[in-house]
């Protein structure tokens, strides 16, 4: 018996030792220009490259339940690679990468990298190759063959799912050679172009996770998921004002976590959702699928399974009444760090300190200088390495009403370190703001220059040796990108075939110090309104107070699902801009209660009757009828100071149509000249659908400006029309300069008069002094 077992094991070992045909190391690549494929397509007899144990099926796949729900995802380089999506790998910059995530409640069971690339026709076949890494683990190698040179090539590379984690980086490394001896890595013939249609095919399988709030906000929001966070909100029926406020707090908190990903909050009335969702319920008013849930005696937050699908989770916000739901919502927004178990009871949420204007966590502080370390979003953001180091980017989110008109620049103290160039050459650091070049500085080759403090002048053109950097103020907006590019000349030895100089390229390292500072504390807050661009880019004026404590939202009585969705999406968007939930937002369904209030007003659904006849309203949508005022002159870009004559309403047109339309309008509050009204209007369910799509889409929001934004099937059209008013405060002398900014001739006349008056006063003063000196007896 032992001998039989011995021979069976020997045969098995011998068969597993046969080499596998690695057909996909150089995959089926039919060039788009008529050329033969580099390698025949994989057949079922040829196992895949990357197989952990040849001959063992599925050895590189994670062990998961066979009946779990799954989804197939295709991520193209156009979606996940740095802009523009394509990559050009060169001899001195051979690496390119893409990044993707995996949710905590999912696992990848299958992954395939599809590449479309074109190698340089000057490459040496086989010696040149493309290496594929996943999280720095080699997945495979694609040799460049003679048939592929200069032709578009299609290739597939299996990715081992066992190496996929919550955050993943696929790195492509180009190994290029164009001659056997005396190569120069900087040669322009060394390149490989990877097309933006390349991508990853992934199969995700959902896991049946435990109902445990210690992982909250997972699975309702997962930071590893780069998609828009779509989170349905379920109500028993049309919510009253208290429940609207509670749901708005929850939506704004999830918006603050979603950030750049975006957010969407579909609303369901007494319907069972088909995905992870938030459910609001009281003892007396609850959806039918919770009718058997025990009554509660306090605000409770509970995580339960979907009644029909254990892979879907519901977060139930339960209370005895709307007051309990409001307390539970504030518990989610401010006490979630204490969550654990299947449910928690929110005993108390007590405010200790009030919020201050302009203190939104996502905004650069304007009360003191801010260090670059405070602006980092990940650990290694302020450093870079390579023969050509990648650019270092810093995001600056500013209040839209920061008054920078007469500023000569924003002061920055910059401390940076870098690998010294071996010789004095033209290596430099370039500084850009919002893709506009500001200035460059040479990188010195002297030892004492490793730590530099510089100043970028705004008006003069010479270095003055001071320890500041100034940014031209008028180039700043609400969202800004400050970029530092370190450009090295990288001298590389060469030679001839008979006398070749070889060398090992050494990477350059650059660092912007965390202690570098930028100072916005010297500037006033002042802005001409209405300005829908400020609302679309930063949620202003509501976001002036991050907790929306000076905002009143006017809702229709018994709002429908679309109107509730507009409320939740809007406060979610504002939360994404500020990074803080709207815990002190006021919601009302009675338009008469806003009279005399010192607050900014957000209107959803329809203009209250008392405001419909306001002369400052420039558009109104009511059922199938709508009217709009158009300006004397519409300019594509706003001036530094708004021209009120151009904005004056020339005509008013009234139309009736059955087609869907929505609009966002802004005007001055009739109850306080320092307050604003923003109204989000629609004429039909389809109109609200377009309105919500515009609020959630950053690209569409970018087209909003002026006082009116009309949303139709064709897109968004904006107008600057109607009266201009000003929000904020300027000293009297700044107001004079601001008022004269659009009138240079008047400014010159006033300047001349001022000079004449000053000269006359000085002349009179000198006459008096001279008279007293010559006639002391007259004193």
UniProtKB/Swiss-Prot annotation:
A GO CC annotation given for this chain: plasma membrane
Keyword line: c-di-GMP, Cell inner membrane, Cell membrane, Cellulose biosynthesis, Membrane, Signal, Transmembrane, Transmembrane helix
Transmembrane stretches, start-end: 743-763
A Pfam entry, by short name: BcsB
Biological pathway: Glycan metabolism; bacterial cellulose biosynthesis
Cytoplasmic compartment segments: 764-779
Keyword Cell cycle: no
One GO term of the biological process aspect: cellulose biosynthetic process
Localization per Swiss-Prot or TrEMBL: Cell inner membrane
Stretches assigned to the Periplasmic side: 26-742
Primary location class: membrane
Signal sequence region: 1-25
Subunit structure: Tightly associated with the cellulose synthase catalytic subunit.
Function: Binds the cellulose synthase activator, bis-(3'-5') cyclic diguanylic acid (c-di-GMP).
Further information: The genes bscA, bcsB, bcsZ and bcsC are constitutively transcribed but cellulose synthesis occurs only when DgcC, a putative transmembrane protein regulated by CsgD, is expressed. Cellulose production is abolished in E.coli K12.
The family this protein is said to belong to: Belongs to the AcsB/BcsB family.
Protein name: Cyclic di-GMP-binding protein
Native organism: Escherichia coli (strain K12)
UniProt lineage: Bacteria, Pseudomonadati, Pseudomonadota, Gammaproteobacteria, Enterobacterales
Gene label: bcsB
